């Protein structure tokens, strides 16, 4: 938010050629504030799948994080797990840990549920989540995993790279990922991404940088550093990430997560999701 406001204030005098951020909701919002210029090139279109970039070319995803279920291998049989909506059912009462509704990742996930299942069903799901909470929502995904390890809850929802970092440090931690919604919409994914600023003084070079960032070489670096999935799906994954297996992604265009963000916030406020 602060950087977007700064770019708006700087206008034509901005020194920034590229704006980069960590969530499609933020990228979409930046697009509504008229700080990007449209960049549609054959290189970016061939490297990055259509659902991971703005339909008008304002921004493109550069790395992918899936937001899925993490569970205690000591207390949960994976056959009990299935979907995001299943976590709203009675069997998870007092066993669920979630991240606060104030965080952009939560807003984007709920926005995707509104898009895929409608406002009424989304309300039912989020209401069930709130009823099933074992504790006040956490500030960070790492805190959710800490709470599961401490026995405070049995299941949670996290971005995959947080799990990757934990497993890198503690390979024998009794936690596993479960890919949600594999028989329906697929796992909700989000991106970190970037776009060329409207008043970029080095626009041609900025476009070249964006193209390079979408390339196999850059994507391999990007993914391995943060335990994320490459947005360019023509390259192999980091070793830790590969160990989690393949999964079906939700192919909703991520600009929709931005458009429905305000609806997601209102829904969560109405249900007192902290």
Question: What is the meaning of each model-derived region?
Answer:
Residues 1-28, 274:
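Early extracytoplasmic/lumenal segment of secretory-pathway proteins
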Residues 68-75, 189-202, 221-224:
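A bilobed periplasmic-binding-protein/Venus flytrap-type ligand-binding module shared by bacterial periplasmic
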Residues 14-19, 37-69, 85, 95-98:
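A structural signal for short loop-to-beta-strand junctions that line the ligand-binding cleft
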């Amino acid at each position: 938010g602060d950087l977007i406001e700064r770019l708006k204030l700087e206008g034509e005098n901005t020194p920034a050629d590229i704006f980069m951020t960590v969530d499609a909701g933020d990228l979409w919002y930046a697009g509504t504030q008229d700080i990007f210029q449209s960049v549609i090139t054959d290189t970016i279109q061939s490297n990055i799948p259509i659902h991971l970039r703005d339909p008008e070319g304002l921004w493109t995803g550069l790395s992918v994080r899936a937001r899925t279920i993490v569970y205690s291998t000591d207390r949960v049989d994976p056959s009990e797990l299935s979907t995001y909506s299943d976590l709203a059912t009675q069997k998870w009462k007092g066993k669920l840990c979630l991240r606060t509704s104030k965080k952009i990742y939560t807003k984007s996930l709920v926005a995707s549920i509104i898009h895929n299942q409608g406002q009424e069903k989304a309300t039912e799901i989020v209401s069930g989540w709130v009823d099933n909470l074992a504790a006040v929502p956490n500030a960070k995904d790492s805190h959710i995993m800490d709470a599961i390890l401490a026995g405070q809850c049995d299941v949670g929802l996290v971005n995959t790279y947080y799990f990757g970092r934990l497993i890198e440090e503690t390979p024998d931690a009794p936690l596993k990922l479960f890919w949600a919604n594999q028989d329906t919409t697929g796992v909700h994914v989000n991106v970190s991404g970037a776009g060329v600023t409207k008043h970029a003084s080095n626009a041609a070079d900025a476009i070249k940088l964006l193209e390079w960032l979408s390339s196999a070489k850059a994507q391999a670096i990007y993914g391995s550093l943060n335990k994320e999935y490459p947005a360019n799906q023509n390259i192999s994954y980091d070793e830790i990430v590969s160990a989690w297996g393949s999964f079906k992604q939700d192919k909703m265009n991520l600009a929709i997560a931005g458009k429905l963000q305000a609806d997601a916030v209102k829904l969560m406020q109405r249900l007192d999701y902290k």
